[in-house]
Amino acid sequence: MKMRRYKLFLMFCMAGLCLISFLHFFKTLSYVTFPRELASLSPNLISSFFWNNAPVTPQASPEPGDPDLLRTPLYSHSPLLQPLSPSKATEELHRVDFVLPEDTTEYFVRTKAGGVCFKPGTRMLEKPSPGRTEEKTKVAEGSSVRGPARRPMRHVLSARERLGGRGTRRKWVECVCLPGWHGPSCGVPTVVQYSNLPTKERLVPREVPRRVINAININHEFDLLDVRFHELGDVVDAFVVCESNFTAYGEPRPLKFREMLTNGTFEYIRHKVLYVFLDHFPPGGRQDGWIADDYLRTFLTQDGVSRLRNLRPDDVFIIDDADEIPARDGVLFLKLYDGWTEPFAFHMRKSLYGFFWKQPGTLEVVSGCTIDMLQAVYGLDGIRLRRRQYYTMPNFRQYENRTGHILVQWSLGSPLHFAGWHCSWCFTPEGIYFKLVSAQNGDFPRWGDYEDKRDLNYIRSLIRTGGWFDGTQQEYPPADPSEHMYAPKYLLKNYDQFRYLLENPYREPKSTVEGGRRNQGSDGRSSAVRGKLDTTEG
């Protein structure tokens, strides 16, 4: 009897040890692309027998009454050229260092009572009423938070300023916040106020703004890149943009972004762009596309950060996909405030083919931290920042002990308050075709391997219905252009130029066609969109 109990006890102990070992093994596997490696073996071996490589030129089956193509973008020409190295005229473009400037913008002002108020978020009295000389502001009455330089400033209304019996005002410290801004200084945007940040009560304005570095890999998302530059151009201090002469699939491609930088297309933002050139394709990337996908971000981070000069440990690093655009207010908050934790993510509005097909939920991907954490915890590797939990990294405890900051991951925005936009497959039909044939060999099924999926008429039908390549159909209605955070402001202000992203070009509901035409102005915008623009601009 005792022997049986002893054996039973040993069996339970062995089962417990096996369970613990399995859990450790499973935890280790969760950080290795093991399923992807398995998935990448069979499809490639078999597909080469059944499918030829995709043709370079988009193929469209002829159909009567076929709608005209919206645009002929730069990338519609054949990308399968010999690998291109930088020309002599711009051969140093990918070797030049970038000196980060100091941000001298005066974001905050002080009230005469000693309060610190964020200018864009505070209600100010621009035109004093007659007979109230106490509301007039002189140069010597206000000073910037950032330094001794004194400038004429508008009078900052305080939350507790009240008229006394004889017309005198009592001065208090608080600021009166405009809609969308919160906190004692009116510098906390809604996407932070309604986020899961656990240290909101510790937020304080900085004396010196951080510099913000935004890193992106680019293939042919030039319209979305233009939108990013206009959305974030005044708050981001350096855009680190990586371009390769190979697609994610390993095929040669021309360096179109480098060409656009040198021919003046992006002249308005050229002074803030650090160009990174990846001139090789990683070994094994053709067999396992995730190797190539990860390597692009690793190279982008390491080469880009190594060429940044005047970099400080508390500067902010944000790495995005080209179709992920953070909202300006959230990025500006990270620049101007102390007290938030790291790493951080953005809740982004999800859409497909254009902003008109809104998808449920949000995209929430960890994409930012300080330069200090990027170097000390993630080993200067952007893909680790996006895909690895910080507490699995070996040096995170040392970083906490050295800095005195407890690492807590949080996200700007919420499922109800978007902090950016993720516009997936947002191209013209030709652009979607190019994305199909350029896609990595790891995100299966790889739809670019199927000839019928590359047909332009089929692609147009997907845009019209919101369907997917596997035959599933959209189960949610088109988005309303008048809704908050429908699209970045630059898109709405240039409606005609980006109409293919804002309106479904292949679908016109019969019941609303005439009514929509009656509500459109001379610029082609609907009354709802015009009203929204008037509100935002006012």
From Swiss-Prot:
Catalysed reactions, semicolon-separated: N(4)-{beta-D-GlcNAc-(1->2)-alpha-D-Man-(1->3)-[beta-D-GlcNAc-(1->2)-alpha-D-Man-(1->6)]-beta-D-Man-(1->4)-beta-D-GlcNAc-(1->4)-beta-D-GlcNAc}-L-asparaginyl-[protein] + UDP-N-acetyl-alpha-D-glucosamine = N(4)-{beta-D-GlcNAc-(1->2)-alpha-D-Man-(1->3)-[beta-D-GlcNAc-(1->4)]-[beta-D-GlcNAc-(1->2)-alpha-D-Man-(1->6)]-beta-D-Man-(1->4)-beta-D-GlcNAc-(1->4)-beta-D-GlcNAc}-L-asparaginyl-[protein] + UDP + H(+)
GO MF annotations in UniProt: beta-1,4-mannosylglycoprotein 4-beta-N-acetylglucosaminyltransferase activity; glycosyltransferase activity
GO BP annotations, alphabetical order: amyloid-beta metabolic process; cellular response to oxidative stress; cognition; lysosomal protein catabolic process; N-acetylglucosamine metabolic process; negative regulation of lysosomal protein catabolic process; positive regulation of protein localization to early endosome; protein localization
Subcellular location: Golgi apparatus membrane
UniProt keyword list: Glycoprotein, Glycosyltransferase, Golgi apparatus, Membrane, Signal-anchor, Transferase, Transmembrane, Transmembrane helix
Disordered: annotated segments: 121-151, 509-538
UniProt EC number: 2.4.1.144
Coiled-coil regions, chain positions: none
Residue intervals annotated with topology Cytoplasmic: 1-7
Gene Ontology, cellular component aspect: Golgi membrane; lysosome
UniProt pathway annotation: Protein modification; protein glycosylation
Disulfide bonds: none
The keyword rRNA processing is assigned to this record: no
Residues carrying sugar: 245, 263, 401
Residues passing through the membrane, by range: 8-23
Record carries keyword Acetylation: no
Membrane topology, from the record: Single-pass type II membrane protein
Membrane topology (Lumenal): 24-538
Family: Belongs to the glycosyltransferase 17 family.
Subunit structure as annotated in this protein's UniProt entry: Interacts with MGAT4D.
Function: It is involved in the regulation of the biosynthesis and biological function of glycoprotein oligosaccharides. Catalyzes the addition of N-acetylglucosamine in beta 1-4 linkage to the beta-linked mannose of the trimannosyl core of N-linked sugar chains, called bisecting N-acetylglucosamine (GlcNAc). It is one of the most important enzymes involved in the regulation of the biosynthesis of glycoprotein oligosaccharides. The addition of this bisecting GlcNAc residue alters not only the composition, but also the conformation of the N-glycan.
Name under which the protein is recorded: Beta-1,4-mannosyl-glycoprotein 4-beta-N-acetylglucosaminyltransferase
Organism: Rattus norvegicus
Source organism phylogeny: Eukaryota, Metazoa, Chordata, Craniata, Vertebrata
